[in-house]
């Protein structure tokens, strides 16, 4: 009879790796799916849903990410300050040009589970608008995403 084993938190922390992803000409949704899977640890053999076993991800060139179709023109992103009249509306073009890091972060956050682990998982995501980052000491592995 086979025995099933559960991953311990300490073992998961010891095996974490760093990945570097270049977002140049990648579609936002497809990039976000792959990044969310790596952050959760679903690409590992010993995936356990209740343990944060995912790896760290660094995304560079976030301002070169692509929205398909007419989303850059038609989609709007909303923020509210919880004050009267505090609704801010941003178009897709504005989000890509000024807030591309926030656009990717929101997209990845929407693909994570809605529980206590999601904030902890999202803290392992680092997004930079250009190709310079401050994580050379971690020696990240370059992850080539072949997305159509």
From Swiss-Prot:
SUPFAM superfamilies: Ribosomal protein L13. GO terms for molecular function: mRNA binding; structural constituent of ribosome. The keyword Ribosomal protein applies. Part of the 50S ribosomal subunit. It comes from the Bacteria. NCBIfam families: rplM_bact (TIGR01066). One of its GO terms (cellular component) is cytosolic large ribosomal subunit. This is Large ribosomal subunit protein uL13. This protein is one of the early assembly proteins of the 50S ribosomal subunit, although it is not seen to bind rRNA by itself. It is important during the early stages of 50S assembly. GO terms for biological process: negative regulation of translation; translation. PROSITE patterns: RIBOSOMAL_L13. Signal peptide: none annotated. It holds the Pfam family Ribosomal_L13. It comes from Ureaplasma urealyticum serovar 10 (strain ATCC 33699 / Western). HAMAP family: Ribosomal_uL13 (MF_01366). The keyword Ligase does not apply. Belongs to the universal ribosomal protein uL13 family. Keywords: Ribonucleoprotein, Ribosomal protein.
């Amino acid at each position: 009879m086979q025995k099933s084993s559960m991953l311990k938190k300490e073992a998961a922390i010891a095996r974490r790796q760093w990945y570097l992803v270049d977002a140049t000409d990648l579609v936002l949704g497809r990039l976000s799916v792959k990044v969310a899977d790596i952050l959760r640890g679903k690409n590992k053999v010993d995936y356990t849903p209740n343990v944060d076993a995912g790896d760290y991800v660094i995304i560079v060139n976030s301002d070169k990410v692509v929205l398909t179709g007419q989303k850059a023109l038609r989609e709007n992103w909303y923020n509210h300050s919880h004050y009267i009249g505090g609704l801010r509306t941003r178009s897709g073009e504005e989000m890509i040009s000024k807030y591309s890091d926030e656009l990717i972060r929101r997209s990845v956050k929407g693909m994570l589970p809605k529980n206590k682990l999601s904030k902890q998982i999202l803290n392992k995501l680092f997004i930079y608008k250009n190709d310079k980052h401050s994580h050379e000491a971690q020696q990240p592995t370059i992850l080539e995403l072949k997305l159509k």
